[in-house]
Amino acid sequence: MGILGMRRFIREHELSVHLSIQMERGLYIPIAVDTWNVLTPIMRRLDPGNMMDPVERTLRGIMQVFSLLNKKSCFPIFVLDGGRKRAFKGPVKHDYHNIDHRAPTDGDDLEASANENQPHSLAGNAPRLASGARGAHQSSRRKTALRATPHYKLCWDLITASGFPTVYVKGMEADYGCANLFHTKTVMYVWSSDSDMVFMGCDVITDLTPAFPVAVFSKHVLEYLNMTQREFANTFVDCHTNLHSPETIYSFAAKLLEHRCGSAIDEPPAASEESSASDQQSADEDEHGAWSRYTRRPPRRADAAAWGAGPGGNGQLKGVSVLCGFPSDARPFDCAPARRRRLPQRREEPAARLKKNREFLAYMNSFIGCKVINNRHTLIKRVPIRQETFDPVEIYRILHEYAPTMANKWCAEMLVKCKLKPVPPLRDVAYGKATQINLC
């Protein structure tokens, strides 16, 4: 899920920054955690050969997440969506009363595993990907995917028993829950590698592992492109991978070129079979790869004036000290390879595409946009949050249920390495001590 090509653009134009965080003792940074988006790459790094037991791999991943959050003095709100991977889906009517924020059951665990690689559409009109040879290829990866699937019920139980707040939005995307928490000022950042968070106007921490975490600020991206948030959303909604199929989607670079030129690009570039395969591989890597992967490649400088960056594009947010500057060296625009300006392989009816885009933006705005109450008050309704007290006995019981012989060792290791302790209520952090945070 995300905006096709946005991560590549942010990497090449050096729009990500490193933050130095200095916290006073007892203060926390409220942060929303896109749980599966963060946990899955960590589990892959812990067990690249997929040889570890699924329960142990899930536990090790959770312990590493807890340890990172503790080192950075973060107060996390874990957002979970059931773990189902959905390919393309149209917008649906949103109702907060239908959000099932209760604890997931074992049925959800099995459902998530069974649907890990199966396309799903909420609107019922999305194209199916698993057909012909591609369907056979997906079925061949099924066993590996099921073995790599984390235990969602185990994750939920350990998170709640540790006393951290949770948001469970079954049947919906966790990204929208994270964006809602950010725009309601419940959290200051979102920990996720999904470019869709930047599309929704959130300040994102893409990698919390380094001593100086990597972050992307939506305000910096908008100032660099000299766009408003509304203009940015209306332009790049054509690049959303959850809304458009691979045959009808634009890349970020292609849509930006069309926006700068002021006219649509009618003909896709001609390419041989070899170049098409290279393009597809590049698109897959750009869409599914982690942001940390791009940091190993040599950066390319960009010309801010060529992209229309207005005055103040290199400014810094209050309270945050950026450890690297924004690009200033020139790079000709037309030197970008044509494969990075990916055009749709199949044209849609303009009216139908425009209608679908507007419905999706309205659906997204229902999560992060303001609503008028009683013709007087304007507010954004927050998703329901659940928080329980820290219970080490419950942690032991959970581990004993999944691994009776290793429960003592894992429980002691989890309490010591993660430095678990009673956490303050969310209200005290979000509305009290959070105002005293000093980031420099």
From Swiss-Prot:
GO biological process: symbiont-mediated degradation of host mRNA; symbiont-mediated suppression of host gene expression
InterPro entries for the chain: PIN-like_dom_sf
Top EC class for this record: hydrolase
Record's compositionally biased regions (Low complexity): 266-281
Keyword annotations from UniProtKB, A to Z: Decay of host mRNAs by virus, Endonuclease, Eukaryotic host gene expression shutoff by virus, Host gene expression shutoff by virus, Host mRNA suppression by virus, Host-virus interaction, Hydrolase, Nuclease, RNA-binding, Virion
Gene Ontology CC: virion component
Keyword Nuclease belongs to the record: yes
An example Gene Ontology molecular-function term: endonuclease activity
Keyword field contains RNA-binding: yes
Residue ranges, annotated region (Disordered): 98-144, 265-312
Entry's localization field: Virion
Catalytic activity, EC: 3.1.27.-
Function (record text): Minor structural protein that acts as an endoribonuclease during lytic infection. Degrades host mRNAs in the cytoplasm by cutting them at preferred sites, including some in regions of translation initiation.
Family: Belongs to the herpesviridae VHS protein family.
Name of the protein described by the UniProt record: Virion host shutoff protein
Organism per entry: Psittacid herpesvirus 1 (isolate Amazon parrot/-/97-0001/1997) (PsHV-1)
Name of the gene this protein is made from: UL41
